[in-house]
A protein has these predicted regions:
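N-terminal glycine/serine-rich phosphate-binding loop of ATP-dependent small-molecule kinases
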Residues: 1-96, 108, 125, 231-243, ...
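A conserved beta-strand/loop element that lines the FAD pocket in flavoprotein oxidoreductases
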Residues: 211
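Residue-level signal for inorganic ion chemistry
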Residues: 24, 47, 75, 103, ...
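A generic structural motif
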Residues: 32-33, 101, 288
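Short beta-strand-loop/turn "lid" adjacent to the catalytic site in phosphate-handling enzymes
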Residues: 64-101, 130-136, 169-192, 217, ...
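Active-site core segments that coordinate phosphate-bearing ligands/cofactors
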Residues: 5-8, 69, 107, 114-178, ...
Length: 502
């Protein structure tokens, strides 16, 4: 057996490849950004071929870094979820750009679905989701309805649909495996999370030909092997692709949240809080959604999830659009230079509000600005906004789960911010635990792949590899934090419903 597991981590703004050894340590890593396309306000697209090429390139770089003696036992994939790709079965050519999870172009389709009596209840009951442009189903419908000839070609069986892990597995296996794992399938709004199968009624309602859909599979099994002849990946020929999970479920697994009641938050482009709710799907009454966390060894685990669309992207906005900071780290330095945000509240609803508000028509706002407001106050307001968003999610989760969450495990790029995590602990009134090895999303995919081929023998062995770096505990007075949170809710009310429905 090989000495390493290769994890392919395909994210919203970059593709990464990480090689893990048996101790869960990073042995080699490569990362590459790829272009974002914004054809209209509120629309977000990726070129699927750029996704593939960037992922292929970083895998080749990571293998080269490790050297010619690297022996790979298996490949795990984790990915940005909901992003929707439609391609030609024969040529592998995409028929259109990938419609990214952040894209709001299908808000009108969602509005019509909501107007149908009983539709919201049916979708919630079967899929665990709310009707929102976030999920893949309406994105796929848009492609079929708007790309010339796509619907006819789909009905003739000439096209294939997939989320990003499906696309990557299909490319790696030379088209031999057209599959999706249960965690990604559960984010499409087409998948019944109770039967673990595509739902014929929902596909019919959205006019989705079922011949397009990939075969649903568990999160830890051999899907196929890498074909020879992929440039830079010749050494992977014959290596099994054997683990896959959506990025947030993968992070939950990688954080060792394997027991009911354990929760994590990923501070990435968006913010994603997930709680393991065990082997029974819990229906949310507080604006959250229910998804498959993973299916392993014949046992399916579910998660409550709250997703916000813009978190780390707000820091990128300060840097790239406003030019207030030169690097992401500078946001932290500026925020630490002031004791608070000076009464400024920023709601980063650039592409609407996710859980628990689900307002497709919200847009970003900054309130409380005075002549004394500095860029340091704005920087701190951004970091505090991210913590407020997570607090919204955690409050909803506590309400739905009916049990107390005693610690929040955290990861993601923005989790390096001590300022933000201190404030997060203050707001939640519980410890916030950051691990030493922050690549928990990639490690989750590696662990699922490793378990499939016996690289690791048990989830207990995987869980023991997690080590804390720092645990943040509440410091500010609760009354002060409660008042700040009250004002945050006022600021959110200013952002809601800003765009008028067409």
């Amino acid at each position: 057996m090989g000495s390493f597991i290769l994890a392919l981590d395909q994210g919203t703004t970059s593709s990464r490849a990480i090689l893990f050894d048996r101790g869960g340590h990073v042995a080699a890593m490569a990362q590459q950004t790829f272009p974002q396309h914004y054809p209209q306000p509120g629309w977000v697209e990726h070129d699927p071929l750029e996704i593939w090429e960037s992922q292929r390139s970083v895998a080749a770089q990571a293998l080269e870094e490790l050297g010619p003696d690297a022996r790979i036992a298996g490949i795990g994939i984790t990915n940005q979820r909901e992003t929707t790709i439609l391609w030609d079965k024969a040529t592998g050519e995409p028929v259109y750009n990938a419609i990214v999870w952040q894209c709001r172009r299908t808000a009108g389709i969602c509005d019509k679905l909501k107007e149908t009596p009983g539709m919201a209840e049916t979708i919630a009951e079967k899929t665990g989701l709310v009707i929102d442009a976030y999920f893949s189903g309406t994105k796929l419908k848009w492609l079929l309805d708007n790309v010339p000839g796509a619907r006819e070609r789909a009905e003739r069986g000439e096209l294939l649909f997939g989320t990003v892990e499906t696309w990557l597995i299909w490319r790696l296996t030379g088209g031999a495996a057209h599959v999706t794992d249960y965690s990604n399938a559960s984010r499409t709004m087409l998948f019944n999370i109770h039967t673990l199968a595509w739902d014929e009624e929902l596909c019919r309602l959205l006019a989705i030909p079922m011949c397009l859909l990939p075969r649903p599979v568990s999160n830890s099994e051999i899907y196929g092997t890498v074909v020879p002849g992929i440039e830079g990946l010749e050494a992977l020929a014959g290596i099994p692709v054997c683990g896959a999970a959506g990025d947030q479920q993968s992070a939950l697994f990688g954080q060792g949240c394997h027991e009911r009641g354990q929760a994590k938050n990923t501070y990435g482009t968006g913010c994603f809080t997930l709680m393991n709710v065990g082997g029974r799907a819990v229906r949310s009454r507080a604006g959250l959604v229910t998804s498959v966390a993973w299916s392993l060894g014949g046992k399916t685990i579910y998660a409550l999830e709250g997703s916000v669309f813009n978190a780390g992207s707000a820091i990128q906005w300060l840097r790239d659009e406003l030019g207030l900071i030169g690097t992401s780290h500078e946001c932290d330095l500026l925020a630490e230079s002031v004791p608070d945000a000076g009464g400024v509240y920023l709601v980063p609803a650039f592409t609407g509000l996710g859980a628990p508000y689900w307002d497709m028509y919200a847009r970003g706002c900054i309130v409380g600005v005075t002549r004394g407001t500095t860029r340091a106050h704005i920087a701190r307001a951004v970091l505090e906004a991210i913590a407020f968003e997570v607090t919204d999610l955690m409050n909803a989760m506590r309400q739905d789960a009916g049990c107390e969450i005693t610690v929040l495990r955290v990861d993601g790029g923005a989790s390096v911010s001590d300022v933000m995590l201190r404030f997060q602990s203050d707001l939640l009134r519980i410890p916030v635990d950051r691990p030493q090895m922050v690549e928990t999303t990639a490690f989750g995919a590696a662990a699922l792949a490793g378990l499939a081929v016996g690289f690791w023998q048990s989830t207990d062995e995987v869980r023991a590899l997690r080590v804390s770096d720092r645990v943040f505990s509440p410091e500010r007075a609760q009354a002060e934090c409660d008042e700040k949170y009250r004002l945050w809710k006022r600021a959110v009310s200013c952002a809601c419903g800003w765009i008028e429905k067409a």
